[in-house]
Curated annotation (Swiss-Prot):
Known EC number: 6.1.1.11
InterPro entries tied to this protein: aa-tRNA-synt_IIb, aa-tRNA-synth_II, aa-tRNA-synth_II/BPL/LPL, Ser-tRNA-ligase_type_1, Ser-tRNA-synth_1_N, SerRS_1_N_sf, SerRS_core, tRNA-bd_arm
Residues where ATP binds: 262-264, 349-352
Location(s), subcellular: Cytoplasm
Name under which the protein is recorded: Serine--tRNA ligase 1
Pfam families given in the database record: Seryl_tRNA_N, tRNA-synt_2b
GO MF assignments: ATP binding; catalytic activity, acting on a protein; serine-tRNA ligase activity; transferase activity
Gene giving rise to this polypeptide: serS1
Provenance organism: Lactiplantibacillus plantarum (strain ATCC BAA-793 / NCIMB 8826 / WCFS1) (Lactobacillus plantarum)
Amino acid sequence: MLNPKFVRNNPELVKTKLQTRKVDPAEVDEYLQLDQQNRDAITKVEGLKKQKNQLTEQIGQSDPQSEAGQALIQQVKQLNGDIKSTEAAQTEVNDRLHYLAIRFPNLPADDVPVGPDEDSNVEMRKHGDIPTFDFKPKAHWELGESLGILDFDRAAKVAGARFVYYKDAGALLERAVYSFMLDLHTQKQGYHEIIPPYLVNAQTMYGTGQFPKFKEDVYTVESSGMTLIPTAEVPLTNYYANEILSEDQLPTYFTAMTPCYRSEAGSAGRDTRGLIRMHQFHKVEMVKYCKPENSYDELEKLTDNAEEVLRELGLAYHVIKLSTGDTGFSSAKTYDVEVWMPEQGVYREISSCSNCLDFQARRAMIRYRKADGTVDYVHTLNGSGLAVGRTVAAILENYQQADGTVKIPKVLQPYMHGMTEIK
């Protein structure tokens, strides 16, 4: 949620920035008008209540049966009616104001490229050599099926499209990948490992910005209203919801490996085969809480934490800065890390690292007390470290051999019981 005081004091800047994120400036004008009406109503109610209190004191000092006393009583009754009608009108205004406020995305940072979609994203850097093959590389799903480690057909039989069974060395590889990631984040990068709930309530989904805008993208259990998490960002960011931290608790880093559940409502026809776009998948998530003045430095570190996983795995990648039209709802600035996929001959997203500033903290009421005693909102950041299934896909494609076998990256071999290849 945006800082209402900032919106109030910088209306043209806010309209310009939100317009780059496909928000009609007229909605900002409506918000500002309602905000003024709401504050005027609050002031009016306070004034009416003050008058009522003064009259009530006068009634207590007079004869209520006298003409003057009766007049005072009638004035109080009139004030009660005015207070009730003003509060009712204010409630209506406030409801619409809140409706707009929770649907405004975050304001993009000044250095975010302006553009309507992914075509306006900017490449920041590349790392690693793109592998060359003296044979036509196969897609990861072909390799997985021929090696007997991925079974999409039987998964479709029991759950439908966009599900998979991992088998034998495939299951071991998946487990090895996320175990390696968690060890790197916790043992080297300073993260605390969390195993969070995989079902959360609606308020928690609201806190990180998934609700109300993206309800169609998730799975909700109708009997309870609980939602299967689309990412561990949701429970990790809400860990400190409605709390005031001490300054010495910042920064705090959390990581978790969880299943993630997504309906992929807007993805019909895209990535219909393989591990790239699933309804259920594992992901290692990184979440940071920090002081406002440090959040952009923390974003650079967070992105490097994700990149380090790929460097250790020996996978080529590049980093792009997302444009205003491609940046996520809650984010002010996002880097996507994309890994090279040989069969398609393109880079594909494997991590998205975002600085949300105080946007999520305002929704989830996460604050900290400064040394001088004042209270401010923390800044929150999140990033994939990494999407596990996509990492498995990248390993299968980049480490495949001409005979259809797949070599295992050295850093994963200790997690694979010493296995050096899948055959």
